[in-house]
UniProtKB/Swiss-Prot annotation:
Its cofactor is pyridoxal 5'-phosphate. Belongs to the class-II pyridoxal-phosphate-dependent aminotransferase family. Histidinol-phosphate aminotransferase subfamily. It is an enzyme of class 2 (transferase). PANTHER family: HISTIDINOL-PHOSPHATE AMINOTRANSFERASE (PTHR43643:SF3), HISTIDINOL-PHOSPHATE AMINOTRANSFERASE 2 (PTHR43643). Its EC number is 2.6.1.9. This is Histidinol-phosphate aminotransferase 2. The keyword Transferase applies. It comes from Legionella pneumophila subsp. pneumophila (strain Philadelphia 1 / ATCC 33152 / DSM 7513). It catalyses: L-histidinol phosphate + 2-oxoglutarate = 3-(imidazol-4-yl)-2-oxopropyl phosphate + L-glutamate. InterPro entries: Aminotransferase_I/II_large, HisP_aminotrans, HistidinolP_aminotransfase, PyrdxlP-dep_Trfase, PyrdxlP-dep_Trfase_major, PyrdxlP-dep_Trfase_small. GO terms for molecular function: histidinol-phosphate transaminase activity; pyridoxal phosphate binding.
């Protein structure tokens, strides 16, 4: 008798719609047989990674790579803590931010009477990982201008809310919540409810924020801030994220972490990248100029777009976006349609170099005109 393995997992996994990343350059080249491809789909740094990080990687010894990592004893811990103005015992290093969300759910929401809370059009990984663990999810609607209504989140939160997930700025919309609203949320929710503030795009929005969320950690020990080396530092391929939280929360995460979760190359590269302020400033300058370039192009074509504090813009095609998406693929340009978020008329485009942005806008004009 044959076994239907599809029926063996629990219902949460059987009904799961997996996260689908942006199409890769290799995948498109194989599908279309083209080689001149630009990827503006996954919010990667178009300048590449920090040159200081690359230099360290290129001079790495074979013995260093051959040894197992020891992240909690690596000098990155003290250096990152000093850079963030926190204590090393407040840091937890991770194989990207996604693993942070999973381990937090396992530790603080995986109970029969607990649920998580987020909002519509939030980063899809929160719901995917909660569903895989059969943790109930409550989601509040957002406003007409795509803003997150913090009062609605406060009203939806109760003693059974294990974790609130909020990305600030949000992905895939790019919308920023002002810090006073986040502070109000912290003051209103139960002390047993964790607020996980996903700040993957923090560096792009920092100039618009009046307060650093890390300043609230002492007053609000239920705050967990997550950040990453994937975006501004250009290290998405090395997978290194981190959480900043109360030491008691960090200790719990360390109890259940997988062994050797952060690799040697990522640790050394991040240690070097923290010092690369020239690269950070170049990345921010390119992003700011590219944002204006894309906005001007959209305005010329009367295309509506959402206000963004990230390194991407989400725009409205006013019809199903797949026709434009496929047209761009045929022209060697990878962007991100947002059907997975039930935003069927929208596309998210990463801000690229001036040349990449020009090529994208030219293709856009050719499609619409």
């Amino acid at each position: 008798m044959s076994i239907d393995f599809q029926q063996l997992p629990h219902a949460g996994i059987r009904s799961l719609i997996p996260y689908v990343p942006g199409k890769s350059i290799e995948e498109l080249a194989k599908e279309k047989g083209i080689t001149d491809i630009i990827k503006l789909a996954s919010n990667e740094n178009p300048l590449g990674c920090s040159p200081l990080a690359l230099s360290v990687i290129q001079t790495m010894s074979s013995h260093y790579i051959a040894t197992y990592p020891s992240p909690w004893n690596h000098p990155l811990m003290s250096k990152l803590a000093s850079y963030l103005k926190v204590k090393p015992e407040q840091l937890f290093l991770s194989n990207g931010s996604d693993y942070l969300f999973n381990i937090l759910l396992n530790c603080f929401a995986l109970h029969t009477d607990r649920h998580i809370l987020t909002h519509d059009y939030a980063f899809s990984t929160y719901a995917i990982q909660a569903n895989s663990l059969q943790i109930p999810i409550n989601s509040v609607p957002i406003g007409h201008n795509w803003e997150v209504n913090i009062t609605d989140i406060v009203n939806a939160c109760n003693q059974q809310t294990g974790i609130i997930f909020i990305a600030n700025p949000n992905n895939p919309t790019g919308v920023l919540i002002q810090q006073e609203e986040i502070k109000y949320l912290l003051e209103q929710i139960p002390k047993s409810t964790l607020l996980v503030l996903d700040e993957a795009y923090y560096e792009f929005a920092a100039s618009q924020l009046t307060v650093n969320s890390l300043d609230w950690l002492e007053e609000h020990p239920n705050l967990v801030v997550t950040r990453t080396f994937s975006k501004i530092y250009g290290m998405a391929g090395l997978r290194l994220g981190y959480a900043i939280a109360n030491p008691s929360i960090i200790n719990i995460l360390k109890r259940v972490q997988l062994p050797f979760i952060v690799n040697q190359v990522a640790l050394a590269a991040a240690y070097a990248a923290i010092d690369d302020d020239d690269f950070i400033q170049s990345s921010l300058k390119m992003n700011n100029e590219g944002m204006l370039q894309l906005q001007a192009g959209f305005n010329e074509l009367n295309i509506k777009y959402l206000p963004s504090s990230c390194n991407f813009l989400t725009f409205d095609c006013e019809e199903d976006s797949m026709a434009l998406y496929n047209y761009l693929l045929d022209n060697g340009i990878i962007v991100r349609p947002l059907h997975a978020y039930k935003m069927n008329n929208f596309i998210r485009v990463t801000i690229g170099t001036k040349e990449q942005n020009s090529r994208f806008l030219t293709a856009l004009k050719n499609f619409y005109l």
